[in-house]
UniProtKB/Swiss-Prot annotation:
InterPro entries: Ribosomal_uS8, Ribosomal_uS8_CS, Ribosomal_uS8_sf
Organism: Gracilaria tenuistipitata var. liui
Gene3D superfamilies: 3.30.1370.30, 3.30.1490.10
GO process terms (BP): translation
Plastid listed as a keyword: yes
Functional summary from the UniProt entry: One of the primary rRNA binding proteins, it binds directly to 16S rRNA central domain where it helps coordinate assembly of the platform of the 30S subunit.
Taxon lineage: Eukaryota, Rhodophyta, Florideophyceae, Rhodymeniophycidae, Gracilariales
Record protein name field: Small ribosomal subunit protein uS8c
GO-annotated molecular function: rRNA binding; structural constituent of ribosome
Protein's cellular compartments: Plastid, Chloroplast
Assembly notes: Part of the 30S ribosomal subunit.
Length: 132
């Protein structure tokens, strides 16, 4: 059983990027699905689809590469708020990842969104991860 599905998802994506895989399979939860939707909206992945039965669902994520050498669009992923140490910030304290090149994924009262959208709506929340 996986205790931290978000960290597991980020690790699977990181490993698939390093191995230059086109598709990666991750466990489907409401939170991982919402994070993947944000990644798709921000252009870090092509698409995703949910497969499996009710109690055993998975997400198939199509990763994005650029150039002839298939350089990954996602350079790095970092988990920030962990089950043992939650990290929260209001909208004024939300970090800019690499000066705005990357994104922070925030869990707010209005759902999971990027740091840009959270700042725009004036929402703070739990900082789940950084992606650049």
């Amino acid at each position: 059983m996986i205790n931290d599905t978000i960290a597991d998802m980020l690790t699977r994506i990181r490993n698939a990027n390093l191995a230059k895989h086109q598709i990666v399979q991750v466990c489907s939860t409401k939170m991982t699905r919402n994070i993947i939707k944000v990644l798709q909206e921000e252009g870090f992945i092509y698409k995703f689809e949910e497969i499996g039965e009710d109690n055993n669902k998975y997400l198939l994520i199509s990763l994005k590469y650029k150039g002839k050498r298939k350089k990954p669009v996602i350079t790095s992923l970092k988990r920030i708020s962990k089950p043992g140490l939650r990290v929260y910030a209001n909208y004024k304290e939300l970090p800019k990842v690499l000066g705005g090149i990357g994104i922070a994924i925030i869990s707010t009262s209005k759902g999971v969104m990027s740091d840009y959208h959270a700042r725009h709506y004036g929402l703070g929340g739990e900082i789940l991860c950084y992606i650049w």
